[in-house]
């Protein structure tokens, strides 16, 4: 499929069912098989991974599912540094830095193989950034807004720029979840904020 459609490779985002216990070995076997097959064709294999640590510092069980063999087999990892907790803990700047520190420090991943993930949505519930802006036109200038009578926490323009600059200076790159949740207004766009942050 990669060759047929001209893809650069495959990103493995395995979230369910949990990959721990006996299935951890099966997951490792799958990743090693895919890595061999893709690398033989000059293709990439990347993996989305949990942040590694929760907003209150606890290690996520999922992080251990990515064995050293798996981490060595992939070309880079996409650290999902969001959904770290309720309220402002969902995806703060500090949470992103701590997530990167877990993978680079505790797990010894080379920084160039660690890609920082940022959300284009808010919690609790699920509110895309564009929808948040529709509810509060000033939402881009902060990380908290009221949407349908509910407190929603997300990353505004300043936080996204700061995270992008951190990724530029310390990591292998930045990724988003996900593009359709942004706004078409280039002056308030989070994708535009990333562009400014990585310059």
Identify the meaning behind each predicted range.
Residues 1-4, 57-70, 154-168:
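Short, acidic/polar
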Residues 2-19, 46, 77-80, 173-177:
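Short acidic catalytic loops
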Residues 114-199:
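Substrate-binding cleft of secreted/luminal carbohydrate-active enzymes
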């Amino acid at each position: 499929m990669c060759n047929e459609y001209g893809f650069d490779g495959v990103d493995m985002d395995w979230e369910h069912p949990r990959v721990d216990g006996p299935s951890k070995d099966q997951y490792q076997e799958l990743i090693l098989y895919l890595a061999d097959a893709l690398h033989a064709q000059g293709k990439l294999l990347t993996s989305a991974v949990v942040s590694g640590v929760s907003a209150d510092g606890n290690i996520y069980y999922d992080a251990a599912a990515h064995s050293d063999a798996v981490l060595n087999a992939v070309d880079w990892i996409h650290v999902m540094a969001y959904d770290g907790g309720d309220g402002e803990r969902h995806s703060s700047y500090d949470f992103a830095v701590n997530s990167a520190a877990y993978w680079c420090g505790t797990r010894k991943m080379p920084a160039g193989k660690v890609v920082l993930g940022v959300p284009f949505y808010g919690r609790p519930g699920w509110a895309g950034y564009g929808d948040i802006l529709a509810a509060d036109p000033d939402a881009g200038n902060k990380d908290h807004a009221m949407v349908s009578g509910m407190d929603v926490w997300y990353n505004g323009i300043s936080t996204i720029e700061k995270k992008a600059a951190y990724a530029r200076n310390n990591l292998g790159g930045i990724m988003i979840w996900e593009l359709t949740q942004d706004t078409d207004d280039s002056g308030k766009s989070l994708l535009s904020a990333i562009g400014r942050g990585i310059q």
